[in-house]
Amino acid sequence: MSKVYLVGAGPGDEGLITVNGLRLIQKADYIIYDRLINYNLLNEKKSDAKLFYVGKEGMKSSWKQEEINNLLLKCAREEGKITLRLKGGDPLVFGRGSEEALFLKEHGIASEIVPGISSSIGGLIYGGVPTTHREVSRSFHVFTGHTMDGPAELDWENLAKMEGTLIFLMAMSNIETITNKLIAAGKNPDTRAAFIYKATRSDQRRFITTLKDAYECKCNNDIKNPSVFVIGDVVQFADDIDFFAGRPLKDRTFILLRKKEFNQDFKDYLIDNKAEFLELETIKYTPIHDDDFDKALKNIEAYKYLILTSRNAVEFFFKRALELGVDFRRFYNIKIASIGQKTMKDIEAYGFKADYVSEKYTSDEMIKNITSKFEKGTKVLYPHSDKAKGNIRAALSDYDVDAFEIYKNSDEAYEKMYLEDKVYDIFFFSSSEAISFNKFYPELLKKARIYSIGPYTTKSIEALGYKVYKEAKVHDSEGMIDLVKEEINYEE
C-alpha cells in the first residue's frame, strides 16, 4: 500500500534530522523537497529514487501549493510506493504540512508526520539564545511574520504584555511593522532582541540589538530570510552560550564530488571543524560486463601482475570476481600494483596486499613503478574505467597486457539541484568530476575556489577555462585535507 510521509529535515545542519526521518529518506521512492533542507540528506536516498524540487524563495515560487498537492497525489497513487515530502524545520510549524496532510486525507491517501527541529528553537540555540531561562523567561511564543495575505495581523496589545520570549519566523519584510506595533502597544523599547540569519549553516550571522533599534539593524546589515527574530531578556545570554561563532571555516561551503563512500575521512575532518559541505555525486559509476574479462578472471593464474589504479577499479574488479565465484586462493602468484594509500587499503579490505604502491597519485609515477619492477614479457591484467587515459597501456608495450574497461563514468542520470549563487570551495579528485560539474554548474565554477588533486586534473580544469586555486602536494585524500588545513591557518 502506498503512503506519504511528511518529514521535517531540521533547520539546516544535516546532523539535526531525526533517526526516523533519515530512515525514511533511505526507503522513499519519491522525494519532494524544499529549498531550505540540507542537500546532503538526499545522498542517503535509494539509487533509483526520484527527486522533485519544489522550493520557494521568499514569497516567490515556480511551484504553487496546488501544484505541490497534485504532485503529492500523483506520486502517492503509485501502488506500493513510498512518497516523502521533505520540509525544512518542522513540517507543521508554518510549513504548510497540515494543509498537505489534510489534502491527502480528503483524497483517501494515508500519511504520517515525522517531526523535525524547528528553527524557532534550534536556530536560536545555534545563535547562543535559549528559548527559556527560569530567571528571566518561563515561556516562549512563536509567530509567523508573514501570511499568505501579507503582514501578520496579531493582537499587538496582548503580545506586548506577554511574559517570556517572542519569536518571529519569516518576518524580515515586516520588521518595521512588528517593532513599531509592539512599542506602540507598550512593549519596552529597550527590550533585548536578536536576529539569527541562516541558522546552523556555515554563513550563519547573529546580530544583537534592541526592540527600538531592530529595524535599523536589519537594514544596515541587509538581513534577509531565512532569519529568526527573537525578542526577550534571554538574548542577554547569547555571548556566554554561543558555541558556533568561533568556527575557523565560517562562511565557507565545501563541495565534494566523489562517491560518498570515499569521502568519510574528509567529511569527518570538516565536521570536526564545524565546516559546511555538500556532497554532489554528478557521476554515476556502473559496471561493464565483458565476456573476455570474465574469462580472464576465471583464468587468473595466467597473470603475473595486476594493476589497480583507483578505488573504483578495486571495487568493480573484486565485486566481479566474487560474482563469478573466483577462489581468491588462486591469486597466490600475482603481484598487485596500485596508486595511493587509500587504494591500497581498499585492496587490503579484500584480504590482499599491494606489492607496489605509487605514493604520488599520478599515472606517470605508476608507469615508473611498473617499468622498473615488472618483469618484461610477463602477463599483466589491467582493468580500468572507460575514461582511463591511454598512457599506462601505451607504456606497457614490453609486456603481454590484457586491458579491459570494467566500469564506466556517466553523468546522464544526474539531476541538477538548486544551489545558492555564492562562492564555493570545490574539490576535484579527477578530471571526469571537473568535466561533469562544468556541464551542470558552469556559473558556480566561474567564481569558485577550485582545488585539484593533482597535475592531470589541474590540466583538465584549466582546459575548461578555469583557474585552480590550490593543487594538492600529495595527490590523495590526505593531500586534499591538507589544503583545508592551510585555509584554517590562513583564516586564523
Go through each PLM region and give its residues.
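Conserved anion/nucleotide-ligand pocket segment
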Residues: 147-194
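Class I SAM-dependent methyltransferase SAM-binding "motif I" and its flanking Rossmann-like core
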Residues: 13, 90-162, 207, 356-362
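A short alpha->loop->secondary-structure connector
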Residues: 105-108, 131-133, 184-190, 324-330, ...
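Short beta-strand/turn micro-motifs composed of small residues
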Residues: 33, 87, 115, 144, ...
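Class I S-adenosyl-L-methionine
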Residues: 1-14, 19-117, 122, 220, ...
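Structural motif
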Residues: 3-6, 29-30, 49-52, 81-85, ...
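A glycine-rich beta-strand to alpha-helix segment
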Residues: 69-125, 164-179, 191, 379-401, ...
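Signature of uroporphyrinogen-III synthase
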Residues: 5, 11-12, 49, 58-79, ...
